[in-house]
């Protein structure tokens, strides 16, 4: 749901009948509609037999429960949230553009990516020449900004920072200004 204009997500269920026959799809309104606290999700099964097996296992473990708020909120989000989601996508894209432009103009050592989906911007900080612990310590102690750590997603994430762009522009601007000022002291 959270994809920039022009991007498209291909679901495994839409590939081939053979793959669809062994695929179970989990979806949730949590990130898209900011409903994480309601713990709501939906599962799409390929066959009734797979669904019945899964439901029986949930019941056996005594975890097959929803709350009334999550059901109503999920239905409302998917039925009536399209206009809100369209506005959110524009806002997120504008925030991503701001991050890229700010870094290009003020923090050339940092290189934000163009995300294919979601509101998390990966920023390549390898040009600073710090290992992951030094980078995190520098950002927290000198810049006063706690980024998500890229290396938590594997070796390829080393030297990268994750910035949540789903917040007011003023918060992003303040964080980037603090990073700019801290890097200027190097």
What are these regions (language model features)?
Residues 1-14:
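Conserved PLP phosphate-binding loop immediately N-terminal to the Schiff-base lysine helix
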Residues 23, 110, 145:
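Short, conserved active-site loop motifs that form the nucleotide-linked donor/cofactor pocket
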Residues 16-19, 105-110, 186:
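Short helix-capping segments at alpha-helix termini
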Residues 16-93, 100-101:
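Conserved core segment of the aminotransferase class I/II
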């Amino acid at each position: 749901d959270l994809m920039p204009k022009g991007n498209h997500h291909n679901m495994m269920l839409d590939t081939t009948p053979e793959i669809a026959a062994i695929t179970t799809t989990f979806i949730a309104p949590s990130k898209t509609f900011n409903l994480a606290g309601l713990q709501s999700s939906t599962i799409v099964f390929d066959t009734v037999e797979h669904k019945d097996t899964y439901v029986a296992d949930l019941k056996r473990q005594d975890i097959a429960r929803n709350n009334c708020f999550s059901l109503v909120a999920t239905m409302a989000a998917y039925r009536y949230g399209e206009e809100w989601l369209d506005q959110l996508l524009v806002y997120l894209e504008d925030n991503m553009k701001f991050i890229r432009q700010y870094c290009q103009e003020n923090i050339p050592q940092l290189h934000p990516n163009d995300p294919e989906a979601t509101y998390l911007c990966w920023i390549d900080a390898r040009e600073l020449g710090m290992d992951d612990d030094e980078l995190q310590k520098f950002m927290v102690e000198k810049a006063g900004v706690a980024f998500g750590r890229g290396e938590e997603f594997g070796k390829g994430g080393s030297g990268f920072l994750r910035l949540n762009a789903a917040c007011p522009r003023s918060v992003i601007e303040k964080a980037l200004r603090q990073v700019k000022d801290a890097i200027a002291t190097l």
